[in-house]
């Protein structure tokens, strides 16, 4: 293997006898395998084919590669690149590099007779070929076999090519929305269906716009299309909110109904205000965080809520006395217990509060009225003692008639419950 690499690179003999008769490998062998110096010195424009070594043959054809002096070059190892000059930006495949010899260029497409040249593929898509076959048939519909026949008759390349192109024709007919399948009638002879061009895409397909398969267009239901045409234009992004005419009519009828039936004659003014059109609502601009303090108007509204909420100040004698002075118009009912003669001790948080002067006469008058009532009851009882003879008493029978009837019914219910037990 080492001898082959050294012989191809021209580095000299692969083996040299040493002083001891052994084999010595030169450093050029390692450099030829690992060095990439040839890649930096490689130039496409200045590439020249090296001459063959005298008296030797090149069985592998390595020296036919232009501009490659190193055996490790990928161009030398690829036999598909033989005989084809390389151009930057244009990759060369193995099939195209072997077809034409050097110096022979392919003819332009206009000068090629596709009906007789079996080596040049027509520069048309399969959809275009199908459309051309349908147009050439002069019929409204065509079968799949007729499409195959027209393509092979007019393009010699497909007569000698692999028959897999027929699968591509069938796939285009099935997947392309430009073609419609027409079922065969019962009385028509033959097998299979027909194909024709969709009139919606006929003009664009014939002009060459549908050389490749496109996505199907979006179809809108006719009902939605009419509704979209009847509705007004869309609401603009900026500006006040607009309401359609139907909503305005409903709002007007609701206002008229509530203004006539829901409001009486005495509230005519309020009903009149309801019938007025509603003002447009203006959106409030949010205040930045730096202006979170209340405005002067808000401070005026919050002014009555301000006050001294200190408990010591609230229960101060002077403050509480001033508050109790406002209770003079109220009638305070004193307690009905005999302890009303005792002085009331008002003490809050260890602070004594004097009893108002208005409480004194009311307590004394209530005590006098209580004594008078007790005296009146005692004297009336003494004047009308209980008559034990029974002449002035009610007979006990009427008093217990209702009670006896209720007691008898209760006992009867309990007897029925006892039977179940």
Swiss-Prot record:
The gene is FOXJ1. PANTHER family: FORKHEAD BOX PROTEIN J1. Residues 66-80 have a biased composition (Low complexity). Residues 1-34, 48-116, 261-302 are annotated as: Disordered. Transcription factor specifically required for the formation of motile cilia. Acts by activating transcription of genes that mediate assembly of motile cilia, such as CFAP157. Binds the DNA consensus sequences 5'-HWDTGTTTGTTTA-3' or 5'-KTTTGTTGTTKTW-3' (where H is not G, W is A or T, D is not C, and K is G or T). Activates the transcription of a variety of ciliary proteins in the developing brain and lung. This is Forkhead box protein J1. GO terms for biological process: actin cytoskeleton organization; axoneme assembly; brain development; cell maturation; central tolerance induction; ciliary basal body organization; cilium assembly; determination of left/right symmetry. It comes from the Eukaryota. GO terms for cellular component: chromatin; nucleus. Pfam families: Forkhead. Its main location: nucleus. Residues 120-210 bind DNA. It is linked to Allergic rhinitis: A common disease with complex inheritance characterized by mucosal inflammation caused by allergen exposure. Testis, oviduct, lung and brain cortex. GO terms for molecular function: DNA binding; DNA-binding transcription activator activity, RNA polymerase II-specific; DNA-binding transcription factor activity; DNA-binding transcription factor activity, RNA polymerase II-specific; RNA polymerase II cis-regulatory region sequence-specific DNA binding; transcription cis-regulatory region binding. It is found in: Nucleus. The keyword Transcription regulation applies. InterPro entries: FH_FOXJ1, Fork_head_dom, FOXJ1, TF_fork_head_CS_1, TF_fork_head_CS_2, WH-like_DNA-bd_sf, WH_DNA-bd_sf.
């Amino acid at each position: 293997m080492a001898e082959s690499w050294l012989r191809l690179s021209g580095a000299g003999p692969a083996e040299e006898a040493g002083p001891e008769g052994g084999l010595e490998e030169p450093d050029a062998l390692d450099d030829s395998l690992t060095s990439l110096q040839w890649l930096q010195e490689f130039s496409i424009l200045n590439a020249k084919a090296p001459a063959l070594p005298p008296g030797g043959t090149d069985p592998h054809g390595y020296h036919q590669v232009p501009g490659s002096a190193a055996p490790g070059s990928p161009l030398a190892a690829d036999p598909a690149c033989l005989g084809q000059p390389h151009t930057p930006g244009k990759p060369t495949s193995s099939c195209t590099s072997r077809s034409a010899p050097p110096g022979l260029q392919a003819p332009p497409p206009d000068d090629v007779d596709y009906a007789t040249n079996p080596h040049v593929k027509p520069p048309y898509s399969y959809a275009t070929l199908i459309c051309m076959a349908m147009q050439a048939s002069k019929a409204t519909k065509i079968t799949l076999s007729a499409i195959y026949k027209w393509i092979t008759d007019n393009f010699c390349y497909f007569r000698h090519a692999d028959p897999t192109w027929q699968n591509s024709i069938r796939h285009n007919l099935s997947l392309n929305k430009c073609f419609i399948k027409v079922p065969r009638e019962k009385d028509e002879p033959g097998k299979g269906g027909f194909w024709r061009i969709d009139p919606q895409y006929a003009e664009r397909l014939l002009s060459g716009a549908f050389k490749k398969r496109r996505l199907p267009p979006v179809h809108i239901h006719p009902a939605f299309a009419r509704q979209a045409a009847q509705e007004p234009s869309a609401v603009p992004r900026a500006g006040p909110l607009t309401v359609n005419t139907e909503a305005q009519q409903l709002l007007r009828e609701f206002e008229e109904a509530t203004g006539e039936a829901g409001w009486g004659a005495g509230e005519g003014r309020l009903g009149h205000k309801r019938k007025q059109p509603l003002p447009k609502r203006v959106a409030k601009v949010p205040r930045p965080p730096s202006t979170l303090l209340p405005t002067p108007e808000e401070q005026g509204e919050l002014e009555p809520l301000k006050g001294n909420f200190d408990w010591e100040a609230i229960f101060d004698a002077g403050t509480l006395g001033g508050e109790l002075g406002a209770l003079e118009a109220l009638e305070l009912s004193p307690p009905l217990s005999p302890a009303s003669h005792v002085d009331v001790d008002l003490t809050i948080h260890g602070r004594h509060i004097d009893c108002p002067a208005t409480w004194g006469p009311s307590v004394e008058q209530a005590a006098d009225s209580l004594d008078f009532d007790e005296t009146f009851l005692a004297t009336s009882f003494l004047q009308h003692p209980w008559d034990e003879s029974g002449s002035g008493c009610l007979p006990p029978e009427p008093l217990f008639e209702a009670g006896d009837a209720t007691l008898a019914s209760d006992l009867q219910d309990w007897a029925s419950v006892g039977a179940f037990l």
